[in-house]
Curated annotation (Swiss-Prot):
Coiled coil: none annotated. One of its GO terms (cellular component) is plasma membrane. Disulfide bonds join 76-79. This is Probable thiol-disulfide oxidoreductase ResA. Residues 38-175 form the Thioredoxin domain. Pfam families: Redoxin.
Amino acid sequence: MGKSKKKRSIIRFTVLFAIVCAIGYTIYANAASEQGAVKVGEPATNFALVDLEQERFELGQNQGKGVFINFWGTFCEPCEREMPYIENAYEQYKDEVEMIAVNVDEAPLTVQSFINRHGLTFPVAIDERREVTRAYGIGPLPATILVDEHGIVQKVHTGAMTEEMVHEFFQSIVPDA
């Protein structure tokens, strides 16, 4: 009888310890993921990247225009599905809204092949060291950040977008005339 009581105590302690560890890890992971996360209503973190056409894009140089920032990867099926919607909206709003598609650390040849295959004309840059991705707290792809003409984050969206959503998002950051 003594051995089984001791065994139950060890099992209970082990289960309790595992639960405490799981809770601790969850709290740590949530805090770590929010460290760099941008928040709606706050100024967008400035960044500069050179796109595949060798044009420099700096967020801070776009005061007076809304900016549509899309984080994506060629390996991401939802990213691929939304690209035609983004392309159509870009063509419609490119005179009123700036746009940058930030590829998350893939080879330039892979990215260029994807762009060519899909006929994309909007600016695409590769975040080779994931510095911008980390600064914005991006986890799952795709992720879209909308910044208004004053440099304030208006929306943070993670996940695929429908065509209607893409047009609504672009329209929402068109500066007031």
